[in-house]
Curated annotation (Swiss-Prot):
The gene is atpH. This is ATP synthase subunit delta. F-type ATPases have 2 components, F(1) - the catalytic core - and F(0) - the membrane proton channel. F(1) has five subunits: alpha(3), beta(3), gamma(1), delta(1), epsilon(1). F(0) has three main subunits: a(1), b(2) and c(10-14). The alpha and beta chains form an alternating ring which encloses part of the gamma chain. F(1) is attached to F(0) by a central stalk formed by the gamma and epsilon chains, while a peripheral stalk is formed by the delta and b chains. Its main location: membrane. It comes from Roseiflexus sp. (strain RS-1). GO terms for cellular component: plasma membrane; proton-transporting ATP synthase complex. GO terms for molecular function: proton-transporting ATP synthase activity, rotational mechanism.
Length: 158
């Protein structure tokens, strides 16, 4: 089997499983009136995945069945992205970046990490200059504060 054939089969499986789960979640969220685990479970299709039933029971135990519509919305967004979680990142600068700088940094980082990258920009004047970029568990620190600390460490050890 070629890689492209495997990709087609995997996509069909993913679409089928997420479609079934989404249909069950929508049915659960459509219950009107008093929300009890029993009423919500009764609204589920017979072929609803066990995980959806377990979710309903867990939300019911915690008194959070009213959060089902938010879960449906989040699940719909995830399935539109193919199940991938959005990658989050933070760009910290010593001074406020202008819109052109933000756009350039965003373009470079999304080219490297993908279009689902969600960036947050903030300012930390103690950096003196440069940037700190955190994406996932990766950190790129080009700040003057860090460079000066490295120089100081080198001077102390020599």
């Amino acid at each position: 089997m070629s890689a492209s054939e495997a990709q087609v089969i995997a996509r069909a499986l993913f679409d089928s499983l997420t479609g079934t789960a989404l249909q069950a979640l929508r049915a659960a969220a459509s219950v009107n009136g008093e929300l009890t685990p029993e009423r919500v479970l009764a609204a589920l299709p017979e072929d609803a995945p066990r995980e959806i039933r377990n979710l309903v029971m867990a939300l019911g135990r915690e008194g959070n069945l009213d959060r089902l519509p938010a879960v449906v919305t989040a699940f719909e967004q995830m399935t539109r992205r193919g199940g991938a979680r959005p990658l989050t990142g933070e760009v910290i600068s010593a001074v406020e970046l202008n819109p052109q700088q933000r756009e350039r940094i965003t373009a470079q980082l999304t080219a490297r990490y993908g279009p689902d990258l969600e960036l947050r920009f903030s300012v930390d004047e103690s950096l003196i200059g440069g940037l700190i970029i955190r994406i996932g568990d990766q950190v790129l620190d080009t700040s003057l504060r860090t460079r000066m600390a490295a120089i100081q460490r080198n001077m102390m050890t020599s």
